[in-house]
């Protein structure tokens, strides 16, 4: 409305908001009239809130990139073949491409691939790391590797994405405010929840996500998806890349 008022040089603008019921053939129409000054004041307040939020995100990114450049391999020595794997992974992280690697259990594949990608943050080439796995043990190994690198000084944030049926507070109910109380007012609350959570924490596993969601009475599944937009490392099932119904966009 403000953009239209500015474009047409209008002092007042009429706005119509139409709500459509999901399951009934019903509409709720609300009409408003705003002065240009009112619109400017409202938009300025919204922008101020968004800018404060993104200032937190940008400070985290700057600190992440700065500390990633000085991160050493988190163990005193490389195991056999770890150095070679890390070298090839770093080349992919910087230049793109695909690396297929097959190695026995126990060689240290997780840290050998995650470490070079974390280091690449300092070059400004990559914005986010997805770690995909089919097993919960793989998720835990990735989470432990990230925590190990953080203990060595790099400033990272990560979310471990949990399947909806395992984290949902209201299993069996449809994901809409009419059936699930944790969906009600979700988008009214989420900006404040994200701002406080990202300022306070850098690790978001299922237990922490559930505690935050319960404290604010919001959906934990949607919360972890919204957190994934702003963290550095996303650890999740490979379906979130390959399944067209649920994949991250």
What do these predicted ranges mean?
Residues 65-68, 72, 125-234, 239-242:
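A substrate-engagement module of RecA-like helicase motors
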Residues 81-88, 112-116, 237-240:
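Well-ordered alpha-helical segments embedded in enzymatic catalytic cores
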Residues 90-91, 110-125, 144-149:
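Walker A/P-loop NTP-binding motif
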Residues 246-248:
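Short, conserved "post-DEAD/DEAH" coupling segment immediately C-terminal to helicase motif II
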């Amino acid at each position: 409305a403000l953009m239209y008022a500015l474009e047409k040089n209008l002092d007042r603008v009429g706005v119509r908001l139409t709500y459509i019921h999901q399951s009934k053939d019903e509409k709720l129409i609300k009409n408003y009239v705003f002065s240009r000054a009112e619109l400017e004041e409202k938009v300025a307040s919204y922008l101020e809130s968004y800018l404060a939020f993104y200032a937190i995100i940008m400070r985290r990114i700057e600190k992440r990139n700065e500390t990633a450049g000085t991160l050493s391999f988190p163990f005193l020595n490389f195991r056999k073949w770890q150095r070679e794997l890390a070298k090839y992974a770093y080349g992919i992280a910087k230049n793109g491409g695909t690396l297929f690697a097959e190695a026995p259990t126990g060689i240290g594949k997780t840290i050998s691939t995650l470490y070079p990608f974390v280091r690449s943050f300092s070059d400004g080439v990559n914005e986010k790391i997805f770690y995909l796995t089919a097993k919960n043990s793989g998720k835990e190994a990735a989470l432990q590797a990230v925590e190990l690198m953080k203990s060595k000084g790099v400033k990272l944030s990560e979310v471990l994405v949990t399947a909806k049926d395992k984290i949902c507070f209201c299993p069996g109910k449809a994901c809409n405010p009419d059936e699930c109380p944790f969906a009600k007012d979700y988008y009214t609350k989420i900006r404040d929840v994200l701002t406080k959570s990202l300022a306070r924490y850098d690790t978001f596993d299922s237990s922490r996500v559930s505690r935050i969601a319960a404290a604010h009475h919001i959906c934990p599944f949607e919360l972890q998806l919204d957190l994934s937009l702003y963290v550095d490392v996303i650890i999740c099932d490979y379906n979130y890349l390959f399944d067209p119904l649920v994949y991250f966009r």
